[in-house]
Amino acid sequence: MSIERKLAAIMFTDIAGYTESMSKSESKSLDTLEKKRSILKPLLKEYKGTFVKEIGDGTLSYFESAVNAATCAVKLQEATYDDKDMNIRVGIHIGDIVFKDGDVFGVV
């Protein structure tokens, strides 16, 4: 069985302080999460990113271009900069990924 590998830029995002925020106001925190989604999804499309999954307030996406990943990350942070409830953290790594069951794996 062959494994499909692909060189990609992986982008992780999360909202700093989200767990603490949930303990204070679930409704407000869920609204913040929905706002993040509404900003991120069009940016992924614009910069040719592929959304893989969401775990709580974190997301995992990948890009074929490191430049597109970095630009998307900057645009996400610019779009949320003035929102005190949405302190977005972004990590980008580059390396080979493996696809399995709609998910990606790798040491990136």
Regions from the PLM with identified roles:
Residues 1-72, 79:
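Catalytic NTP-binding/metal-coordinating core of nucleotidyl cyclase/transferase enzymes
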Residues 86-100:
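A short glycine-enriched loop-to-beta-strand structural element that forms part of the catalytic core
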Residues 100-108:
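Catalytic-core segments of nucleotide cyclases and related cyclic-nucleotide turnover enzymes
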